[in-house]
């Protein structure tokens, strides 16, 4: 009998040990998924000045962003705000809501995106763009050069 008692204890210990391992693996997997979702660039982001919300979405390998909300959605004449500063006169009738202002960004690894462009409807200019997700903040860098040396960084904030 003492032999079977030790065997049963060993089996019980092994079962509990295996359960702990499975629990640890499942916990790590769930944590990893939660962290990756929290670090995802996809979603809605409010600009640092609070004047607009941009929805970032994935299309194939590219990440793009369109304006989905404006603090001032209408022009002074009461019509929907338009792309009045666009250098191409034909595009000045485009409505700002729905306008893509981020385009062609590629996932560079981790929480970084780059090699894209950002359009500023305020001045009608397009700049090189890179982004980095830091929790609920999206650090967006627009620059004159592809390396991002000559430019500025804006912090956008995730909208729940």
Regions found by a protein language model. Give the residues of each.
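Bacterial Sec-dependent N-terminal signal peptides
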Residues: 1-40
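A short, sequence-level motif marking secondary-structure junctions
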Residues: 3, 58-61, 132-136, 157-160
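Short beta-strand segments and strand-loop junctions that repeat across beta-rich extracellular domains
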Residues: 36-41, 70, 146-150
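Central antiparallel beta-sheet cores of small beta-barrel/beta-sandwich binding domains
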Residues: 42, 48-50, 54-120, 126-127, ...
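Structural recognition of beta-strand segments within beta-rich domains
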Residues: 46-47, 148
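Short beta-turn/strand-loop junction motif enriched in small, turn-promoting residues
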Residues: 51-52, 143-145
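Acidic, glycine-rich flexible loop segments
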Residues: 118-135, 140-143
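Edge beta-strand at a domain terminus
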Residues: 137, 145-160
